[in-house]
């Protein structure tokens, strides 16, 4: 079946959680002139939010948080109980179906970054750095190593807490800032251990705020990312994004694989909201209703409806098109169907799927939401009750 061009392009951009780049320093040419040949230069006084001294503000910021940035080495054991060749009919014909094969183990090494947030040994990092790891080793900048225990992970926000036991020794702690008062153009300093190069620092700015997970290319996450052009490389995942004062404002997470200078960090305020739950081994509540959706405009709906091969007729309005209703979910129980267009929530007009997701998240668990939707030429009002997200990858 041939679909319209815009409909065939539904999907996220490819995203690498660790993408690498190497950098070099170029020597700049200098022009030299005799002092007598030049007129006196005017003295210009400039104001700056960061003091201009012989010491770089970046160095000062990194000296404040850098000692608390850690390297996280992981080992994951993957066990395969059967070999694919055993399912081959010809193999089974010659050797029988009960041919004994012992389980095979494969050990996969991984590496990422993190940072210590209190002197008891609590470390924040990305869930994808430690998820499924059977062994975690944490290395500090001063060379000390500790066995790490994964206390909790949350795939929906890609956050995790790892605990080390300091055994009476003092630990450096990174000061946590806030992400609520950030501005586009603020300095952004990424610290981590890319491609095995410990204690690497890169500098950039905040490119934009509130970048949705769908725009970042990872629509299964519920994060409004900080976008930065500070280089984020393999092994940077889980490391801190600092402001000019050396305070943690985000957790470096991902970049766009189809571009350069576009990286994403989880706002630190979102991490602070769930860190205690993760440290206690708890489950972070994530309400959902169970639909896969996309934004739709009048023009897109008209283009779809003119195509005789379109899978369904779409109401010609701005709204949220339901692409799929997951089985056994609140949406299915409420009677929502594929092809419906959601146009209002609790009486408030809506046309952005990211906003609907925020409304569901903020509503909490077991809360009733009234959805106004269009189905063909009919307008319906359905009530859906939120529930705990069962499988973040669905």
From Swiss-Prot:
Q: Which UniProt keywords apply?
A: Hydrolase, Periplasm, Protease, Signal
Disrupted gene: phenotype observed: No effect in a single knockout, but growth is inhibited at high light (120 umol photons/m(2)/s) or at elevated temperature in a triple protease knockout mutant (hhoA, hhoB and htrA). Triple mutants are not phototactic. No effect on the PSII repair cycle, even in the triple protease knockout strain.
What biological-process terms (Gene Ontology) are attached? proteolysis
Q: State the conditions that upregulate or repress this gene.
A: Slight induction by UV-B light.
Query: Any idea where the PDZ domain is?
Result: 293-377
Recorded hits in Pfam families, A to Z, give:
PDZ_2 (PF13180), Trypsin_2 (PF13365)
Q: Which SMART domains match?
A: PDZ (SM00228)
Among PROSITE patterns, the record links this protein to:
PDZ
List the Gene Ontology MF annotations in alphabetical order.
identical protein binding; serine-type endopeptidase activity
Q: Which GO terms describe its cellular component?
A: outer membrane-bounded periplasmic space
Q: Where is the signal peptide?
A: 1-24
Cell compartment(s), UniProt:
Periplasm
User: What InterPro entries does this protein's entry cite?
Assistant: HhoA_HhoB_HtrA-like, PDZ, PDZ_sf, Peptidase_S1_PA, Peptidase_S1C
Family indicated by similarity: Belongs to the peptidase S1C family.
Matching NCBIfam families: HhoA_HhoB_HtrA
| Function (record text) | A putative protease, its function overlaps that of the related putative proteases HhoB and HtrA.
Protein name listed in UniProt = Putative serine protease HhoA
Q: Which organism is it from?
A: Synechocystis sp. (strain ATCC 27184 / PCC 6803 / Kazusa)
């Amino acid at each position: 079946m041939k679909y319209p061009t815009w409909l065939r392009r539904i999907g996220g951009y490819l995203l690498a959680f660790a993408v690498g780049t190497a950098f070099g320093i170029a020597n700049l040419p200098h022009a030299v002139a005799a002092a007598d040949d030049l007129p006196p230069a005017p003295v210009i006084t400039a104001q700056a939010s960061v003091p201009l001294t012989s010491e770089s503000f970046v160095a000062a910021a990194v000296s404040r948080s850098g000692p608390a940035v850690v390297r996280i080495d992981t080992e994951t054991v993957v066990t395969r109980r059967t070999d694919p060749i055993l399912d081959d009919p010809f193999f089974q014909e010659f050797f029988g179906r009960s041919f004994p094969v012992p389980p095979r183990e494969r050990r996969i090494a991984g590496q990422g970054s993190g940072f210590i947030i209190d002197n008891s040994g609590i470390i924040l990092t990305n869930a994808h750095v430690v998820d499924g790891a059977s062994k975690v080793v944490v290395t500090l900048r001063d060379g000390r190593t500790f066995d790490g225990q994964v206390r909790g992970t949350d795939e929906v926000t890609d956050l995790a807490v790892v605990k080390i036991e300091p055994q009476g020794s003092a630990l450096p702690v990174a000061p946590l800032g806030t992400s609520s008062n950030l501005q586009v153009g603020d300095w952004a300093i990424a610290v981590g251990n890319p491609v095995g190069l410990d204690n690497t620092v890169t500098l950039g700015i905040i490119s934009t705020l509130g970048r949705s997970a769908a725009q970042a290319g990872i629509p299964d996450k519920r994060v409004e990312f900080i976008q930065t052009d500070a280089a984020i490389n393999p092994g940077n995942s889980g490391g801190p994004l600092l402001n000019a004062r050396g305070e943690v404002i985000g957790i470096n997470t991902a970049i766009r694989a189809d571009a350069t200078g576009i990286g994403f960090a989880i706002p630190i305020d979102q991490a602070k909201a769930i860190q205690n739950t993760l440290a206690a081994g708890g489950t972070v509540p994530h309400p959902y209703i169970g639909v896969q959706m996309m934004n739709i405009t009048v023009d897109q709906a008209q283009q779809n409806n003119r195509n005789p091969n379109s899978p369904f007729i779409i109401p010609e309005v701005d709204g949220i098109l339901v692409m799929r209703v997951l089985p056994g979910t609140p949406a299915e129980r409420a009677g929502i169907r594929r092809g419906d267009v959601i146009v209002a929530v609790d009486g408030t007009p809506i046309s952005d799927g990211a906003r609907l997701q925020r409304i569901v998240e903020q509503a909490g668990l077991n809360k009733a939401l009234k959805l106004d939707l269009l189905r063909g030429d009919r307008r319906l009002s359905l009530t859906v009750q939120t529930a705990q997200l069962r499988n973040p990858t669905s």
